């Protein structure tokens, strides 16, 4: 590797033509370092390396010029850059830069005033401004940077250009062998290069590189790309991130800093950006007009304070209808099907007696051994039957007052027809305790001669303790329930009457009648439904 270091003086005039002396002095402030590496064979061209040194700001110390001639192995070659490429790199179209390569006479270099970048087969150019030494790299290409005090290294290489085994790898180092196919790596702290994989469309760009690489997120002036006026962009489409705002929100274009991001925003989409686009600050204003991704159609009443108020008003308007459907005082929405509620969690609807009969109290325990003997008399006397009674007791009193027992006699063992009885007559039910002693004998008189076929009804026989002398007009608050018998009747399609289902009884301990110590007597009351008295079978 041979190097030629030239230092043009600021006062010298530039010479025209590539066939002038090897070093061309012009408006460039700094020095040139040119190196030539002969090819390994006769078929592959040599490699030329040109380094441009720009002195730091405030430095005017002259440099010593060193000039070396290239070996007379290559013929004269010339490369001119067109106006289009020069305009992209900051050159006016009428002043294209020219790079001239001569043969035995030496190495000639012609540069324009604003030329900083070179691309030629077998030519490597490195620009250095604030640092004395730089590294060579292979297969990398950095984007052009605006003039600033920060260091900016730019180089163009070919991957297939093998370095000279005896050449120098960097400035200030002694010549040494370099591994084939690999050059020194550029400092990653200076540039973050975004390379696009694939073949390069231009022969002067290495494999894996791109003629127009993507710009780094931050520019040289320290501003974000959103607040920097757009410059000449790449010729092809490049995805650009935009901040999309909802259609109802208009951003402040005059503000330099963006406010907090809205709670609901659309996803950013990549759209191709033209080279001569509008100002980047105005982009958030019209970006919401761009076509966005398809989203599920939302009800206009679902978003915004006005929509929420309308929905609330609609709910208040529909609440009276729901209350009429479910009953007064209930605002719960109507359900398609009633939800079954466990018997133990039902509320106490009606009287204490009704709650006991329907099993709305949680039982405290069961007593086994009770039996019941059932008989009837009338136009005919059916046979008496004895069935077991399931007895349950409850603890529903905060004080130690006695609670009644509930007994249930299941009639299903008698068959589907139940216990047959005459339409007019008397039913006798005798309850026995586990000791086979009579607890209570119930006698109920009934008359269902007008009952149609395939209907049903019931009778409820009660026994109260009422004060003596108040049998006719006893106050209900003064009555004390002692016994209760609930019978259910059903007429078949042929008109026969029978007891069906079960028989429910409420009774108390015998001490209840003895421990009162009051002048009370028993009073029997038999009740039946009135309107309607009979109900058709389901």
Curated annotation (Swiss-Prot):
Residues 227-238 have a biased composition (Pro residues). Residues 348-430 are annotated as: Required for macropage invasion. The keyword Nucleus applies. Keywords: Nucleus, Phosphoprotein. Its main location: nucleus. The modification Phosphoserine is found at residues 254-255. InterPro entries: Atos-like_C, Atos-like_cons_dom, ATOS_Transcription_Regulators. Signal peptide: none annotated. Residues 1-18, 323-334 have a biased composition (Low complexity). GO terms for cellular component: nucleus. Residues 1-103, 153-185, 197-300, 323-342 are annotated as: Disordered. The protein contains a transactivation domain (TAD) which may be required for transcriptional activation of a subset of target genes. Transcription regulator that may syncronize transcriptional and translational programs. Belongs to the ATOS family. This is Atos homolog protein B. It comes from Pongo abelii. The gene is ATOSB.
